[in-house]
């Protein structure tokens, strides 16, 4: 009796599949051992508020953030300007909650496949992160690799991790938000004064003309005075000008003492109904617009700092030069139209 060729092929395929399955599962590189939900950083988890320094490194980029004496997070690489405490606290919380899910590869040749290759490489996709306490003790330290959302073992979110001094890679629960550019870590907010809270704006050039815009008491319009006389200001121009300090932010910042050869554009003084007065000057530097403030001590009241508590930047506006986005600079530049006249 001749053997059935189809049966032989089926048995060979079944044997090959079984052998391959056994080989993969017995290989140290492809262990599917679970980690029993063990915390990755138990010291951080037990006391996350002890974190005092955050170090990040990837592809040659190094960032360091520390807490100052006022417990404000600052960027050591950006003149100790205030960092986004919301972002840093989120990273601390995400790291503290991380748990080991499964053992992964130990083979260096496979590290780049899951993003846990040496972070010092120029083209590295991995990110090194370290959290330290006030005394320098390490609360968390790891290379963070690729992330995913939902997989075939029931994990909603996961991150591949590896300790920089160990070969073993792991799959851990959760995802981590680690921006690689410094600006994303800074608290880029400057001021937030609602336009309806502004009573009067004075703008002038040196040398040059002066103009004043006041909110009228009758119909909510705006009255201006310039070299042409007195008149009602176009509502769109007034709207843009009076929103110049609303949600004001920056794209770069440095200490006032560090300055360049900038061209002065205009001066301004804003008076709010609360009594707050904010003066400043606008400069042009190549393609950037630079903003500097001149605020008297205690000159800013709570109305100007709404939602901005907990950082040193807003009580020390005079110390910094801010490069602001062009669309925000355009709001201030509406003042030039009023100074130049020809609005009637």
Residue ranges with predicted function:
Residues 1-344:
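Secondary-structure "cap/kink" motif recognition
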């Amino acid at each position: 009796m001749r053997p059935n060729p189809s049966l032989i092929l089926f048995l060979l395929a079944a044997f090959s599949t079984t052998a391959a399955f056994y080989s993969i599962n017995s290989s140290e590189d492809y262990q599917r051992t679970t980690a029993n939900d063990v915390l990755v950083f138990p010291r951080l988890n037990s006391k996350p508020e002890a974190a005092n320094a955050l170090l990040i490194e990837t592809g040659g980029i190094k960032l360091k953030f520390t807490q100052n004496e006022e417990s404000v997070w600052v960027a050591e690489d950006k003149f100790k300007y205030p960092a986004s405490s919301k972002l840093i606290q989120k990273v601390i919380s995400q790291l503290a909650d991380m748990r080991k899910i499964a053992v992964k590869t130990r083979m260096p040749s496979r590290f780049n496949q899951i993003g846990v290759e040496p972070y010092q490489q120029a083209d590295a996709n991995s990110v090194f992160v370290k959290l330290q306490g006030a005394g320098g003790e390490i609360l968390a330290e790891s290379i963070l690799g690729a992330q995913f959302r939902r997989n075939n073992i029931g994990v909603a979110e996961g991150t591949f991790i590896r300790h920089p001094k160990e070969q073993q890679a792991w799959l851990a629960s959760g995802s981590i938000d680690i921006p690689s550019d410094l600006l994303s870590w800074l608290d880029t907010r400057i001021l937030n004064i609602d336009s309806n809270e502004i009573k009067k704006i004075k703008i002038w050039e040196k040398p040059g003309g002066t103009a004043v815009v006041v909110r009228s008491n009758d119909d909510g319009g705006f009255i201006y005075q310039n070299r042409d006389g007195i008149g009602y200001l176009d509502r769109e121009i007034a709207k843009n000008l009076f929103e110049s300090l609303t949600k004001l932010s920056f794209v770069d910042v440095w200490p006032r003492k560090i300055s360049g050869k900038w061209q002065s554009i205009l001066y301004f003084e804003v008076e709010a109904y609360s009594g707050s007065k904010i003066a400043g000057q606008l400069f042009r530097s190549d393609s950037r617009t630079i903003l500097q403030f001149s605020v008297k001590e205690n000159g800013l009241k709570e109305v100007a700092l709404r939602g901005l508590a907990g950082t040193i930047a807003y009580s020390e506006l005079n110390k910094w030069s801010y490069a602001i986005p062009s669309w925000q600079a355009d709001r201030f530049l509406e003042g030039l139209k009023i100074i130049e006249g020809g609005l009637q």
